Amino acid sequence: MSIPKALSPGECAFALHCQAEGLSPEREVVFAPPRKWRFDFYFPDRKLAVEIEGGTGMYGRHQRPMGFERDAEKYNTAAIMGITVLRFTTRMVMRGDAISEVLEALK
């Protein structure tokens, strides 16, 4: 899996963890057309999406009321479609929690 230059620090670390484990998730996968929602990482054969949430230590887009509502709509739609979404903060990725949980989910 190549690592695009526009990744956040958490996404970059998660991509490297995936490489180390021999995993090749798809990146920036659009789902639920005509919506333009994207998953940061997606394992299509397992219907498993991974989202690395940025801006959790500040009042970022995902924590503002409209951003939170849009995220809820996105994740609810994914659930209705049978897609499991695992969400992680950058700190969780750096500690190794994210890759551990993804490996467990892929068993």
Model regions and ranges:
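Nucleic-acid endo/exonuclease domains
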Residues: 1-107
